[in-house]
Structure formats: structure tokens, C-alpha cells
Amino acid sequence: MFRGATAVNLDSKGRVAIPTRYRAEILEKNQGKMVCTVDIRQPCLLLYPLMNGKKSNKKLLALSNFDPTQRRLQRVMLGHATECEMDAQGRILFSGPLRQHAKLEKGLMLVGQLNKFEIWSDVEWHTQIAEDIEIGSSADFAADALNDFSL
């Protein structure tokens, strides 16, 4: 399970070191293999352990090829999906098109979402989280969805 937001750096070759606390799980359950693709609604990447990525692929493949919206979703998400493998130093390499989509430069945020990570440029992340908090502070924010939710 991946939780929390961690500041990380992209090196000159387009690699990022996965924080040590996550490496054992990724190595043990997925042999260090992950799948990265674009988020279709946000300027970030989605980084899944390989087994979770396979589950997402099955869902995408189940969509209709005859529905234009579903076909676009398949094209974008599967077309950008790239298998990545952690190297001996725990780094993952992001391809040029993936880095371009998320506007990745040196400073990044690795954001745990339990079953996956979101990868954000630090600038985009801070803008997005400020907007999310502002919207979340309104009285009617997701009121129906949160009626039965408790922490």
C-alpha cells in the first residue's frame, strides 16, 4: 500500500528513485516491475506495480471498441502505458512522452494512492493540492459521497 506525498528528484536521464520504504513491496510482489501511463484528466502520471497494472489493463480491454469515448480512453491510456523496472538503485526511468505529458522537470512529487502512485511536477502538485483543499473546504463538496464516510 502506497500512502503519502514525497518530494523526489528526476535525474538528467529521466529517472526517479523510488523511496526506500516502498521498494521491498515492489520487489517482492512484482519483481521490481511497474507500469506507467498518463492520467487523462490531470497533468500527472500513474505508476502501478505490474500486478495492479494488469488489473487495470483488463478493465481497459473490457471497454467497447465501438464507443468513441471508450476507444479514446483505451488509446490514450494503453498507448502511453510503459513497463518500467526498478534498477539496482531503486530508480524507475520515465520515457520522454510520459515526462512531457506531466511537465516533469527536476522537482517531482510521488503521491501514494494505495494501489498506485501519482507522479506530479512539484509546481503542478502544489497548484492542484491548493485547489483541492479550497474546493474541499466548501460545505457541499462531495456531500453525498461522504455521507457514509468516516476516518
UniProtKB/Swiss-Prot annotation:
Residue ranges constituting the SpoVT-AbrB domain according to the UniProt record: 5-52, 81-124
Highest taxon, organism lineage: Bacteria
Pfam families in UniProt: MraZ (PF02381)
Annotated GO MF terms: DNA-binding transcription factor activity; transcription cis-regulatory region binding
One GO cellular component term: nucleoid
Subunit annotation: Forms oligomers.
The protein, known as: Transcriptional regulator MraZ
